[in-house]
UniProtKB/Swiss-Prot annotation:
It comes from Staphylococcus aureus (strain MSSA476). The keyword Cell division does not apply. This is Elastin-binding protein EbpS. Residues 1-314, 351-440 are annotated as: Disordered. CDD domains: LysM (cd00118). Residues 2-204, 341-486 are extracellular. Residues 64-85 have a biased composition (Polar residues). Residues 437-485 form the LysM domain. The elastin-binding domain is located between residues 13-33 at the surface-exposed N-terminus, whereas the C-terminus, containing the LysM peptidoglycan-binding domain, is not exposed on the surface of intact cells and presumably remains buried within the peptidoglycan. The presence of the TNSHQD sequence, corresponding to residues 18-23, is essential for EbpS activity but not sufficient, additional flanking amino acids in the amino- or carboxy-terminal are required for elastin recognition. Residues 204-225, 233-246, 278-297, 403-431 have a biased composition (Low complexity). Residues 14-34 are annotated as: Elastin-binding.
């Protein structure tokens, strides 16, 4: 690593024109002519790109790729929903819906091409526009809004065409309950539609053909029995509503019910055709027979639906009551076990408390006994110590008295000896005073000078004579002292 910070800084600021980016730069140079707001002179003269340009470019590329993936996923999901909602028995409606569902993909080609064009020229736009992140976000939001509006218009168009398509058969009094039931089953049970569609459509076609022939033959008799038919239609509508309410909660029974209704529709259509053919030549009273048969069949359906409702209610009540009973039993068992556990715990705690109190009482009594024993032992030890001290004191006093007596005797003997010695010294002094001279010490005289003065020489023998005569032990004498000179 170099020690010069400026060299490293300038080295990191060199132009980014490596061999790995040559292909990308060639594509950028080809597309630069199409950008009118690009300043080519500044790009060629610029040697040092702005700092963090590669980081911003990678960030923009990741954002655009992520937005494209999210947009494609949302587009495919919307197409799948539209295709599932737009499936109709008529081939003409399917073809028209498929052509319209293909239009968003064609319309989305232009914004995708614009995104590819923008990704190609992103590196060139970095040099002239160092901060295009906000414009890119605005561009993405505008494109998403346009795509959403296009998809909404296409879906609205398809729903309008579906609503304008003609009905595949007439809603007569004979098959009105079946048609309402089929519509309700198609809306509530979506997952079983594809399985039972082919079988149901075949049976429905037979019913439609027979019903159409019957209606064409009985056109003359419709005016006579219009009022009666209106009342029958109202009754059929109420019956169909009841059957719809019964078929909402059973998905598994819808398949068998559609199969049964298909066969029933075929039979009703055939009967209607026969009755309508004879109604052209008979009176108005004869025209009411198919309605009677229709009412009988509808009453039979209502009875079946009522039985199914009873069975469903019984089964539903059993399904609801069984978990409740089980839950109550489990909760009761848990409550019993919990109460027993709490009771045992409380009994155990009481016994533990009693045992603890007894133990504490025993410990307290034991402590009291030990304290009493300790106090007794202490008193005994103190008494023995006192007696021992008294004995020691008495013995000590006796020994002191003996010693004092001995000392007194010794002192008395010493005094006697001292007295005798003093008497002897006094006698000797008296003897010396009777046969010698007296000298009074003056000034700085000492025994040596006194011996020279009286004996003519200061020999040790002369000095010792003077000492012995005066009872002196040393050479110390004082002024004014009288000394006997032998």
């Amino acid at each position: 690593m170099s020690n010069n910070f400026k060299d490293d800084f300038e080295k990191n600021r060199q132009s980014i024109d490596t061999n790995s980016h040559q292909d990308h730069t060639e594509d950028v140079e080809k597309d630069q002519s199409e950008l009118e707001h690009q300043d080519t002179i500044e790009n060629t003269e610029q040697q040092f790109p702005p700092r963090n340009a590669q980081r911003r470019k990678r960030r923009r590329d990741l954002a655009t790729n992520h937005n494209k993936q999210v947009h494609n996923e949302s587009q495919t999901s919307e197409d799948n929903v539209q295709n599932e909602a737009g499936t109709i028995d008529d081939r003409q409606v399917e073809s028209s819906h498929s052509t319209e569902s293909q239009e968003p993909s064609h319309q989305d080609s232009t914004p995708q091409h614009e995104e590819e064009y923008y990704n190609k020229n992103a590196f060139a736009m970095d040099k002239s526009h160092p901060e295009p992140i906000e414009d890119n976000d605005k561009h993405e939001t505008i494109k998403e809004a346009e795509n959403n509006t296009e998809h909404s218009t296409v879906s609205d168009k398809s729903e309008a065409e579906q609503s304008q398509q003609p009905k595949p058969y007439f809603a007569t009094g004979a098959n009105q309950a079946n048609t309402s039931k089929d519509k309700h089953d198609d809306v509530t049970v979506k997952q079983d539609k594809d399985e039972s569609k082919d079988h149901h459509s075949g049976k429905k076609g037979a019913a439609i053909g027979a019903g159409t022939a019957g209606v064409a033959g009985a056109a003359g008799a419709m005016g006579v029995s219009k009022a009666k038919k209106h009342s029958n239609d109202a009754q059929n509508k109420s019956n169909s509503d009841k059957s719809n309410n019964s078929t909402e909660d059973k998905v598994s029974q819808d398949k068998s019910k559609d199969h049964h209704n298909g066969k029933k529709g075929a039979a009703i259509g055939a009967g209607t055709a026969g009755l309508a053919g004879g109604a052209a030549s008979k009176s108005a009273s004869a025209a009411s027979k198919p309605h009677a048969s229709n009412n009988a069949s509808q009453n039979h359906d209502e009875h079946d639906n009522h039985d199914r409702d009873k069975e469903r209610k019984k089964g539903g009540m059993a399904k609801v009551l069984l978990p409740l009973i089980a839950a109550v039993l489990i909760i009761g068992a848990l409550a019993i076990f919990g109460g027993m556990a709490l009771n045992n715990h409380n009994n155990g705690t009481k016994e533990n408390k009693i045992a603890n109190t007894n133990k504490n009482n025993a410990d307290e009594s034991k402590d009291k006994d030990t304290s009493k024993d300790a106090s007794k032992d202490k008193s005994k030890s103190t008494d023995s110590d006192k007696s021992k001290e008294d004995q020691d004191k008495a013995t000590k006093d006796e020994s002191d008295n003996d010693q004092n007596n001995a000392n007194q005797a010794n002192n008395q003997a010493q005094n006697n000896q001292n007295q005798q010695q003093a008497n002897q010294n006094q006698q000797q002094q008296q003897q010396r005073q009777g046969g010698g001279q007296r000298h009074t010490v003056n000034g700085q005289e000492n025994l040596y000078r006194i011996a020279i003065q009286y004996y003519g020489s200061g020999s040790p023998e002369n000095v010792e004579k003077i000492r012995r005569a005066n009872g002196l032990s040393g050479n110390n004498i004082r002024n004014g002292q009288q000394i006997v000179i032998p």
